[in-house]
């Protein structure tokens, strides 16, 4: 606390000098309740090597934190620091972050917003909570989430590849029509080269049991969350919670246009390209898929 006061006095003194004004340092110190001798000792203190390194690490922490759109906590920042060669513990990073007054965005656990529309036994849970396929385009999952704006709710439909947790397609709409889901599925099919059987998993919402959806996914194996167990779709439900926690909830969103711009920025410039994920060995989804493709290609060359 005292160091912060000294820093404030120093900054105000420098600002006054640059402006050509006189300022009473003693008066400021007296008003703030700190000693002149203590301030002068602080002012002429030469940082030790340890202090210099600590401040350098804190600067790196701030850069990583800002680059993550101020989302990363100590675990992910520790991983990123170690990638640059820093030898540091997660506990130390957490201590520094506390001193710096920064922390990860907090989120309450995601809540269920979808009501099942079909409880028939014909809809099978093929996925059965097996959330870790061994290749891309083995399992996709899809879901819809509500986003509040001043103009009214808009709806984000997403398709995730469970292998990398990459959002491979998304659509923002002003209605809950099944056509919005179909558009998203078609985008996903156009962007991915599907040459093997594919499972697509969803909850039992009306859009996902409609005949139009079944037609759009006729060459896929449709899998549905069990009756009254929508958390069987936990990965993409969790993603929708994360995009709100890390990004959308910071803004008082005016309308569809602003919501679209914010979602585009988060998904296309951060989530798939930069945001590290524990599931991906602390790589981004794009990097995780590139590593798979490179390893898979090398294995094929060695085998052939």
Describe the function of each predicted region.
Residues 1-7, 36-135, 229, 284-293:
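Basic, flexible linker segments flanking DNA-binding modules
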Residues 9, 29, 39, 61, ...:
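Mobile genetic element proteins and their domesticated derivatives, centered on retroelements
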Residues 113-117, 202-204, 210-212, 224-244, ...:
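RNase H-like two-metal-ion nuclease catalytic core shared by retroviral integrases
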Residues 148, 152, 170-193, 209:
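Active-site beta-loop-alpha junctions of metal-dependent nucleic acid enzymes
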Residues 218, 242-304:
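C-terminal domain-tail junction helix/linker
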């Amino acid at each position: 606390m005292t160091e912060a006061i000294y820093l404030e006095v120093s900054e105000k003194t420098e600002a006054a000098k640059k402006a050509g004004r006189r300022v009473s340092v003693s008066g400021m110190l007296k008003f703030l309740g700190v000693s002149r001798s203590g301030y002068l000792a602080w002012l002429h203190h030469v940082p030790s090597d340890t202090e210099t390194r600590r401040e350098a690490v804190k600067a790196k922490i701030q850069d990583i934190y800002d680059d993550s759109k101020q989302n990363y906590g100590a675990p992910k920042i520790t991983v990123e620091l170690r990638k640059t060669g820093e030898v540091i513990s997660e506990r130390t990073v957490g201590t520094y972050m506390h001193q710096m007054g920064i922390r990860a965005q907090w989120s309450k656990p995601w809540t269920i917003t979808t009501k099942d529309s079909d409880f028939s036994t014909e809809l099978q849970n093929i996925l059965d909570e097996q959330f870790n396929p061994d290749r891309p385009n083995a399992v996709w999952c899809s879901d819809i989430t509500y986003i509040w704006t001043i103009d009214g709710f808009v709806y984000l439909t997403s398709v995730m590849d469970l292998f990398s947790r990459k959002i491979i397609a998304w659509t923002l709409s002003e209605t809950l029509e099944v056509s919005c889901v179909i558009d998203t599925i078609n985008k996903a099919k156009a962007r991915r080269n599907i040459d093997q059987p594919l499972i697509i998993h969803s909850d039992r919402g009306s859009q996902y049991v409609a005949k139009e959806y079944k037609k759009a996914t006729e060459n896929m194996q449709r899998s549905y969350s069990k009756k009254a167990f929508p958390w069987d779709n936990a990965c993409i439900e969790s993603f929708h919670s994360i995009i709100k926690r890390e990004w959308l909830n910071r803004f008082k969103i005016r309308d569809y246009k602003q919501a679209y711009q914010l979602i585009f920025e988060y998904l296309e410039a951060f989530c798939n390209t930069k945001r590290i994920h524990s599931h991906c060995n602390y790589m981004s989804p794009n990097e995780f898929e590139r590593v798979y493709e490179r390893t898979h290609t090398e294995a094929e060359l060695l085998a052939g």
